[in-house]
Amino acid sequence: MKKLFIILVSLLVTASVYSQTYEVNKFYPELGGYVIKTDGTNGVVVAMQDQGAANWYDTEAMVNDASKHDANGAKFNDWRLPTIDELKLVYLLKQSIGGFIDTIYWSSSWDAYGAVWNLQFGGNGNLPDNESPINVFNVRAVRAF
């Protein structure tokens, strides 16, 4: 009976350790960035710094280059461009996240005509636009957790 009790307590402690919950609009170093959406346990974080500027075709290598992330983000290799909907969430939280410049940021979303959706982070220009993938715009990576 004592053995069963110890096993049950161990399972309870283990479950509580692994049931970390996360909130939107908060930085979590262990996730590598700032939470932009979550269901409490799973979600998406955005990197804490831009990865640079590039044409769309060069962004995949850029987002997974550890040297282009802060120390927390460099621990992960599953970074990607945000979808246009995720990029809109990043825009809404840009003041809290910080480090953005007034420029255009790439998304991973394509339109039906071969252009890529992007978002202007400067001024009031927060409406999505679509551009040729050969243009050079800024990159801010996201990753799922």
Positions of PLM-derived features:
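Secondary-structure boundary motif
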Residues: 10, 68-72, 96
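C-terminal, surface-exposed recognition/capping segments
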Residues: 84-145
